[in-house]
């Protein structure tokens, strides 16, 4: 995991994501719905629901929208979303993992396949690239106005049950066992830290350098995938040139 900064990629696309806020709310609503269906509507006893609710609040999703999604998940509505994972290679041979929540797998598969092929990539068989990624809990703490050095932060992370810490001038990035994410988050917050994000994610074990002439194509492919209403997350094992 050394040298890989998920936060750098997040910040690089932040403005574009802000412009898609309506789509972000729609996707979070589906995640809330699925979390409630799986574990009930009480965030105190449903750790996944609490994580998604925190994600919704961080995205400035209105409370009414959150409540509607939770209420819908608590009922017996007609929606029947399924979690689906697609694997493939983007331009330059970059491994890409796509997670989706869909009520129509045929529609979603066709759209994802089109995004790959349209930009010079290709879908692959199940298992082709998923082994290249590890499921991790991921927490970010901004260093702006934070008077804590890296050694102190590392001790606090380990005491909280975290596995690894990466630091940059802008932020501390913390990685955890996925099952311990909620506990680590709670411990850090109890210690007075303000978290920018706390989520489950997929971290590539190794990054592949993106050829300069493929950067734009790969980014356009990722954008098209993220624009799809059914797609919840896109992960790429990409090392972009400076």
Swiss-Prot record:
Cellular component GO terms, alphabetical: cytosol
Primary location recorded for the protein, binned into one broad class: cytoplasm
Cellular localisation: Cytoplasm
Keyword DNA-binding: yes
Gene Ontology MF term list: DNA binding
GO biological process, one term: regulation of DNA-templated transcription
Keyword Transcription regulation: yes
UniProt cross-references to Pfam families, sorted A to Z: TACO1_YebC_N, Transcrip_reg
UniProt keywords, alphabetically: Cytoplasm, DNA-binding, Transcription, Transcription regulation
SUPFAM superfamilies named in the record: YebC-like
Chain segments carrying region Disordered: 1-21
Transmembrane segments: none
UniProt-listed Gene3D superfamilies: 1.10.10.200, 3.30.70.980
Record-linked InterPro entries: Integrase-like_N (IPR017856), TACO1_YebC-like_2nd/3rd_dom (IPR048300), TACO1_YebC_N (IPR049083), Transcrip_reg_TACO1-like (IPR002876), Transcrip_reg_TACO1-like_dom3 (IPR026564), YebC-like (IPR029072)
Family membership noted in the UniProt record: Belongs to the TACO1 family.
UniProt cross-references to HAMAP family, sorted A to Z: Transcrip_reg_TACO1 (MF_00693)
Name of this protein: Probable transcriptional regulatory protein lp_2253
Organism placement in taxonomy: Bacteria, Bacillati, Bacillota, Bacilli, Lactobacillales
């Amino acid at each position: 995991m050394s040298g890989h900064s998920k936060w750098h990629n997040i910040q690089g696309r932040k403005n574009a994501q802000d412009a898609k806020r309506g789509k972000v709310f729609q996707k979070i609503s589906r995640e809330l719905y699925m979390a409630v269906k799986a574990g009930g509507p009480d965030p105190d006893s449903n750790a996944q629901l609490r994580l998604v609710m925190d994600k919704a609040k961080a995205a400035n999703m209105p409370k009414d929208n959150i409540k509607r999604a939770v209420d819908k998940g608590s009922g017996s509505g007609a929606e029947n979303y399924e979690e689906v994972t697609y694997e493939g290679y983007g331009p330059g041979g970059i491994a890409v993992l796509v997670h989706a929540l869909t009520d129509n797998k045929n529609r979603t598969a066709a759209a994802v396949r089109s995004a790959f092929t349209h930009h010079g990539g290709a879908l692959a068989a199940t298992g082709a690239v998923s082994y290249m990624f590890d499921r991790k809990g991921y927490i970010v703490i901004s260093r702006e106005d934070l008077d804590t050095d890296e050694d102190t932060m590392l001790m606090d992370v380990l005491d909280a049950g975290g596995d690894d810490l990466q630091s940059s001038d802008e932020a501390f990035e913390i990685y955890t066992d996925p099952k311990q994410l909620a506990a680590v988050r709670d411990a850090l917050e109890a210690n007075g830290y303000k978290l920018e994000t706390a989520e489950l994610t997929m971290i590539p074990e190794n990054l592949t350098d993106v050829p300069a002439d493929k950067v734009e194509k790969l980014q356009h492919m990722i954008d098209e995938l993220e624009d799809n209403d059914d797609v919840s997350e896109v992960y790429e094992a990409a090392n972009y040139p400076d």
